[in-house]
Amino acid sequence: MEALGPGPPASLFQPPRRPGLGTVGKPIRLLANHFQVQIPKIDVYHYDVDIKPEKRPRRVNREVVDTMVRHFKMQIFGDRQPGYDGKRNMYTAHPLPIGRDRVDMEVTLPGEGKDQTFKVSVQWVSVVSLQLLLEALAGHLNEVPDDSVQALDVITRHLPSMRYTPVGRSFFSPPEGYYHPLGGGREVWFGFHQSVRPAMWNMMLNIDVSATAFYRAQPIIEFMCEVLDIQNINEQTKPLTDSQRVKFTKEIRGLKVEVTHCGQMKRKYRVCNVTRRPASHQTFPLQLENGQAMECTVAQYFKQKYSLQLKYPHLPCLQVGQEQKHTYLPLEVCNIVAGQRCIKKLTDNQTSTMIKATARSAPDRQEEISRLVKSNSMVGGPDPYLKEFGIVVHNEMTELTGRVLPAPMLQYGGRNKTVATPNQGVWDMRGKQFYAGIEIKVWAVACFAPQKQCREDLLKSFTDQLRKISKDAGMPIQGQPCFCKYAQGADSVEPMFKHLKMTYVGLQLIVVILPGKTPVYAEVKRVGDTLLGMATQCVQVKNVVKTSPQTLSNLCLKINAKLGGINNVLVPHQRPSVFQQPVIFLGADVTHPPAGDGKKPSIAAVVGSMDGHPSRYCATVRVQTSRQEISQELLYSQEVIQDLTNMVRELLIQFYKSTRFKPTRIIYYRGGVSEGQMKQVAWPELIAIRKACISLEEDYRPGITYIVVQKRHHTRLFCADKTERVGKSGNVPAGTTVDSTITHPSEFDFYLCSHAGIQGTSRPSHYQVLWDDNCFTADELQLLTYQLCHTYVRCTRSVSIPAPAYYARLVAFRARYHLVDKDHDSAEGSHVSGQSNGRDPQALAKAVQIHHDTQHTMYFA
C-alpha cells in the first residue's frame, strides 16, 4: 500500500490502471452514441493567437480570425483551414511560413456604425503528435496526451462554432418549425452536444441531442408583461409596485438589450438595474453646449433628442452599462438580444414544461441522434476543416457488448423473514415487514393546510390508514396521536414544536401536513433538525385528501429510517468479499447555488455507513468558503471539500462507537465533480482522508478506494436488439454495465445503468476509480456499486447512483433549507450584496449544524 505524502501535484497524479474486464452477468448487445473518429498519423501545428482589444466574446474573436485567414491568404495562410477555439489556440495541418517568429496583423471588421480594428499576433507554440495519441489509445502509453485530445476537440468544433450558438460543449440554433414557450420570457432551443473522448483503440465523438432554455428575442415591454403576469400592457396604467419592480429586476438584470430608436444602429447594452422612478421622473445630468449640466428627465430627453413621445412614461427605465455612468433607457425602446441562454434557475413550472418538451423515449432519442449525424446537419455537408486534417467521423453508432448484472436479494424481517428479489430494478413490500421496525408510541400531527382544505374527518381517516399500513410494515404506530392541531404560517412552527417537546415526554415523531409549496417546509426542517432535534415527516395535503397505499407505504419507509429502524438489508452471502472485514462506505458531494445567486455559499456533505449491512448512515455537513474569496488559480479548490479531514474523522469515530470495529477499508464515492476537475480534487481529498485516519492513530492506515460518480455526461446506451428494450420508454435493463469499447484506454472506469428508466432515456452513471489500495477486480467493484444502488431507504427500487452518494446529495440539499433566512429570503429584497444575507461564515456554519439528538440519525431520509 502506497503512503500518501503531500505528494505530487495533480498534474502528475496517476489513477490506477484497469485491472481487467468484468465477466459477471448476462451479455447484452448495445449501441452507444459514440462515433468512431479516424485520425491520421500526422503532426499538427499549434499557434498562440493574441487579439487586442482583449476580452471580446468568442464570437467576435472567431470573426476576427476568419477574416484574418482570408485577408492574409497570399502572405501567410495559403489554402490552409486552421481550427480555432475562439480564445488563444489555433491549429494547422501544415506549418505556417512564419517559423518561430511572432507575426502581427491588423484586421478590420465592419461594426455597428463604425468599423472596428483589431491587432492580432500569431506565434508558434508546439508540434502536437497524433501518432502518440494513437499509441496511447492502443494502450501502449501510460497516459493519453492531453494536447492531442485538445487539438482534435478544437478542430472538430471549429465549423459548428461558426455556424451555431455554442453553450459549453453543446451547440444550439434558434427555433425553426417549432415553438416551446416556457413562460417568463423564456423558450426551449434544441441543439446537440459534441465532445471527443479517448476510448479503447479509437478516439470517439460523443454526440447527443440536447435542449436548453433561452430568452425569447422580444420587446422588453412584452418580456416584462410575461414576467409579471400582466395580460395587457394597457391595463398597467400605474407605475410598477415595489414587489413588481423587484421581480422584474431579478429577471432582467445581466441580460443584453438592443435599442430600436436609432434606425439601423442597434447598439447593445447590458442591463445593470431597473430604476425606482418612472421615465417621467427619472433624471440625469444633461451636458449643455456651454459645458454646464442640467437635470433632465428621461422622457423629456427622448422627446427633445429623438422627437419620441413615450407611450409608457409611467414605467421605469433600464439602467445599462456601468452603474456609475447613469445611462437610462425607457423600456419601450429596448428589445432582448437574440441567442442569450438562461443561466438563472428555472421555476418549477418551467422545469416541468421543459421536461415534457424534451423527454424522448430511448428509441426516439436513438433515432434522433442517428438522423442528426447521418444528415450531416451538424456539419452541413462535408466539413472542410476535418478534411484538411484528414479526420473522418463514422456515422454509425458504436456497437458493443455490455453485461446485465444480477440484482441482489434483499432481506426483510418480521416473523416470516421474507426475501425480495428485484425484477427490472423494482420490488414490492407487500406481505413483508421491515428488517428492524421501530415501535411508535408517542406522535403528533400538525396541519398547516387550512381546515377547509383538509377537514378533521379527512385527517382522522389519514392517520387511521397510516397506522394500519405501518402495522403491516412492522413499524406499528400505537394509538392515536397525542396532539393534532391546525396551524398557520412559518412563524408558528417554532413555538408549537417547543410546546410539543416540553409537554409530551418521549415524543418520537411530528407528522406535518403542508399546503403545497410553502416556506413552512424549510422552517419545519430548521426547527426539527437544528434547533430541537426532533424527527419530522412532512406530507403534502393532496396526499392526505386522496390517500393511496403506495404513498402511505413510502411514508413508512422514510419514517422508519429517520427513527433508527432498518428497512431491509442485502442478503449477506451474496455480497462481495470486501465485506469480510470491517468496511465503511463514504458518500460525498458539493452542491453550488444556482447561477446568478452569488450570495449563497456552496455546501459540502459527507455521509458514512454505520453498520455492516450497510443500511444506517450518519451525516456531516459544512458551508464552503465563498467563491469570491478564492483566487482564480485556486478556483477548482472550490470543488475540494475544505474540512474533509474533520468530517471523515467524525464519521470514523461514530462508526467505531456504533460497531466497536475500526474499518480496515474506506470506500469513498464522490459525486458532483466535473470531468476536468477530477484529478485536482482527488489528490487533496485523498490526503485529507489519510490525515483523518492518522489523527486517530499514528499507524492506522485503512485501504482507500476513491471513486468519482458522474451523472452529468452525454453517453447514452441503447439496446441493439429491440426485444431487450424495457418498459414504456424502451430503455436498457437495470444492471446494464459497460467497461469496454467506449471506456478509457487504460484507466479503471465503467458505465452502469442501475435503475429502471421510467421517463425519457436512462442516463447511465459513469464511475471512475482514481485511487485503489484495495485492489478491486472489475467484477467486485461493479457488483458492489450495483448492490449499493439497492440500499436507498426512500423507495423499493434500485436508484441511479449508490446510496451513500445519494444521501450526501440529500444532506447538502437539506442544508440549503437550513440556510433559508426567514426574514430575508422569502421577501427577496432588491439587491442584497455580499455573502448570504450578510451573515458571516460563523453564522452560516451554525445554521447548518445539526442538533446533537438528530446528528446520528438519518434525518435526511
From Swiss-Prot:
Keywords tagged on the record: Cytoplasm, Ribonucleoprotein, RNA-binding, RNA-mediated gene silencing, Translation regulation, Ubl conjugation
Subunit structure: Interacts with EIF4B, IMP8, PRMT5, TNRC6A and TNRC6B. Interacts with ZFP36.
Protein's cellular compartments: Cytoplasm, P-body
Gene it is expressed from: AGO4
Its job: Required for RNA-mediated gene silencing (RNAi). Binds to short RNAs such as microRNAs (miRNAs) and represses the translation of mRNAs which are complementary to them. Lacks endonuclease activity and does not appear to cleave target mRNAs. Also required for RNA-directed transcription and replication of the human hapatitis delta virus (HDV).
Post-translational modification: Ubiquitinated on surface-exposed lysines by a SCF-like E3 ubiquitin-protein ligase complex containing ZSWIM8 during target-directed microRNA degradation (TDMD), a process that mediates degradation of microRNAs (miRNAs). Ubiquitination by the SCF-like E3 ubiquitin-protein ligase complex containing ZSWIM8 leads to its subsequent degradation, thereby exposing miRNAs for degradation. ZSWIM8 recognizes and binds AGO4 when it is engaged with a TDMD target.
InterPro entries: AGO4, ArgoL1, ArgoL2, Argonaute_Mid_dom, Argonaute_N, PAZ_dom, PAZ_dom_sf, Piwi
Gene Ontology BP annotations: male gonad development; male meiotic nuclear division; miRNA metabolic process; miRNA processing; miRNA-mediated gene silencing by inhibition of translation; mRNA catabolic process; negative regulation of apoptotic process; pre-miRNA processing
Pfam families referenced in this protein's UniProt entry, alphabetically: ArgoL1, ArgoL2, ArgoMid, ArgoN, PAZ, Piwi
Protein name according to UniProt: Protein argonaute-4
Molecular functions (GO terms): double-stranded RNA binding; miRNA binding; RNA endonuclease activity; single-stranded RNA binding
Any GO CC annotation of this UniProt entry: cytoplasmic ribonucleoprotein granule
Species per Swiss-Prot/TrEMBL record: Homo sapiens (Human)
